[in-house]
From Swiss-Prot:
<dbReference type="GO" id="GO:0005737">
    <property type="term" value="C:cytoplasm"/>
</dbReference>
<feature type="binding site">
    <location>
        <position position="279"/>
    </location>
    <ligand>
        <name>L-citrulline</name>
    </ligand>
</feature>
<comment type="pathway">
    <text>Amino-acid biosynthesis; L-arginine biosynthesis; L-arginine from L-ornithine and carbamoyl phosphate: step 2/3.</text>
</comment>
<keyword id="KW-0547">Nucleotide-binding</keyword>
<dbReference type="Pfam" id="PF00764">
    <property type="entry name" value="Arginosuc_synth"/>
</dbReference>
<dbReference type="GO" id="GO:0000053">
    <property type="term" value="P:argininosuccinate metabolic process"/>
</dbReference>
<feature type="binding site">
    <location>
        <position position="128"/>
    </location>
    <ligand>
        <name>L-aspartate</name>
    </ligand>
</feature>
<dbReference type="InterPro" id="IPR048268">
    <property type="entry name" value="Arginosuc_syn_C"/>
</dbReference>
<feature type="binding site">
    <location>
        <position position="267"/>
    </location>
    <ligand>
        <name>L-citrulline</name>
    </ligand>
</feature>
<feature type="binding site">
    <location>
        <position position="123"/>
    </location>
    <ligand>
        <name>L-aspartate</name>
    </ligand>
</feature>
<feature type="binding site">
    <location>
        <position position="127"/>
    </location>
    <ligand>
        <name>L-citrulline</name>
    </ligand>
</feature>
<feature type="binding site">
    <location>
        <position position="91"/>
    </location>
    <ligand>
        <name>L-citrulline</name>
    </ligand>
</feature>
<dbReference type="InterPro" id="IPR023434">
    <property type="entry name" value="Arginosuc_synth_type_1_subfam"/>
</dbReference>
<feature type="binding site">
    <location>
        <position position="131"/>
    </location>
    <ligand>
        <name>L-citrulline</name>
    </ligand>
</feature>
<dbReference type="GO" id="GO:0005524">
    <property type="term" value="F:ATP binding"/>
</dbReference>
<feature type="binding site">
    <location>
        <position position="182"/>
    </location>
    <ligand>
        <name>L-citrulline</name>
    </ligand>
</feature>
<keyword id="KW-0028">Amino-acid biosynthesis</keyword>
Amino acid sequence: MSKWKDVKKVVLAYSGGLDTSIILKWLQTELGAEVVTFTADLGQGEELEPARKKAEMLGIKEIFIEDVREEFVRDFVFPMFRANAVYEGVYLLGTSIARPLISKHLIDIAKKTGADAIAHGATGKGNDQVRFELSAYALNPDIKIIAPWRDWSFKSRTQLLEFAEQHQIPVAKDKKGEAPFSVDANLLHSSSEGKVLEDPSQEAPEYVHMRTISPETAPDKATIIKIGFEKGDAVSINGERLSPATLLAKLNDYGRDNGIGRLDLVENRFVGMKSRGVYETPGGTILLAAHRAIESITLDRGAAHLKDELMPRYAELIYYGFWFSPEREMLQAAIDHSQRHVEGEVTLKLYKGNVMVIGRESAKSLYSDKLVTFEDDQGAYDQKDAAGFIKLNALRLRTLAARDRK
């Protein structure tokens, strides 16, 4: 293609799945470019070795598979959870938060290998194309970015399958013997889209769920756990200090075994259309509940309410791909400042898809049983003071009412 005629070497974000395997071959045959593959170990597990073998089979000499799990949780997931970020009220941004990290490594590898461009397998209809490219341009304004879904002649996954067969590219099959759902997975979540899920009126088949058992089949006995926090980040489970990635993985196990973290969502994509996805975020769902609980006793009301007002904008920035933007960093600075005293321990009961907070304690707690007690507070609070407080706050309301009565 003439627009890429000067590109000699490309770093491809490679999962080993259908789209990126075909993109790899397409870059070789249509552009004549040397391809370097980068696969991020974000906690997706068995996807990694097949990706290496496919890349080797397709003649790739430079294959980068990097374990970025600790970096992912420490530098991306945990900062996001300090904000209690959810998009459109429910989505914990599991796919969104991984994209800037992948772009960061693509840019680093391009510099290391002398590549002219980077490439990704995001479609021209989705959010990921925006997330990958905004992040990449923020880190290297001169980088060339190839997005084959916007350039090639393929219009459907059926055509991709035909191309794969023509070039003897192996494609994974799901339990139905068909091409698999469009799947994204990392240590925070998994998502499934496409096929029967494109009809939002139909319940997702049980076999779509990869990370959790059904709440109906979860144990009849509740699981009790304690999560410890320091400066807004989870640092321990049941008193055992763990690294960020290890801690999230352990929460995933608790969530999986108790049917926690399933979400069937129709969301508003950045490009303007609505899409339906099935998400599983077992550990993240537990972590969010615990973090909000420890904040409830350690954050001042004004700070907590302002933080809640900022959260939708912060979540939207991540969803839209503006992780490396100045406005996200400004919000992060404010959020991180609010977390200085967010420490302590939260006790949770996990039962059949539910996360219930049953206890919270902190050396920095603002909760005072002497103030709120229904018993004798020994003069800690004079209830007569409330009368003046109420009169002052009622002044404008009484003035309005008097005017309207005329």
